[in-house]
Amino acid sequence: MVSPAWCSIALALLLALHEGKGQAAATMEQPASAPKGRGPHLRFRRCSCNSWLDKECVYFCHLDIIWVNTAGQTAPYGLGNPPQRRRRSLPKRCECSSAGDSACATFCHRRPWPEAEVTSSSQGPAAVLETSKTWTAAGDLLQKLRDISAAKLQFVRLRPELTREAIPAHSRRRKR
């Protein structure tokens, strides 16, 4: 004769397996109910870049890209499908999806890489590094950062004695 403890364990196991089977059947039915004629996944873009090599534009325009830092470069994933039409040959760096997006319009219709201008002043590089607390234009922060970088380069060129001298590499040959 079978003990009541074994019957309880067998009954609990049977109920657990039965519930698990029902969940597996429910998950198997979900993909079947999805429409099969569904087209490619479309991603929301703020604008469309003229060149995939312009990483700043791609980062600005494609809002749902996951950026992965690799050893030598930053690789964008999730760019979607290849373009279905010919490339445009426009002087602008991108084309906005919405005409009312003023931030997009200022980003897309300016030159791709504005050069930072080095201002030679009698006050020195420290005066160039001072910035105001508010910026008037959307790209003003980027311009200020480029000005700071240019001022640092100018400072290093004016004072070469402050830069470190190159340390000679260790010789691989054994000395006798």
From Swiss-Prot:
Predominant localisation class: secreted
Signal peptide residues on this chain, from the entry's feature table: 1-22
Propeptide stretch(es), residue numbers: 23-44, 68-176
Listed SMART domains: END
Subcellular location(s) per record: Secreted
GO biological process, one term: regulation of vasoconstriction
CC annotations in GO: extracellular space
InterPro entries named in the record: Endothelin (IPR020475), Endothelin_toxin_CS (IPR019764), Endothln-like_toxin (IPR001928)
GO molecular function: endothelin B receptor binding; hormone activity
Residues flagged as site, Cleavage: W67, V68
Disulfide bonds: C47-C61, C49-C57
Stretches assigned to coiled coil: none
Endothelin-like: region residues: 94-109
Keyword Cytoplasm set for record: no
Keywords: Cleavage on pair of basic residues, Disulfide bond, Secreted, Signal, Vasoactive, Vasoconstrictor
Described function: Vasoconstrictor.
Sequence similarity: Belongs to the endothelin/sarafotoxin family.
Full protein name: Endothelin-2
Organism: Rattus norvegicus
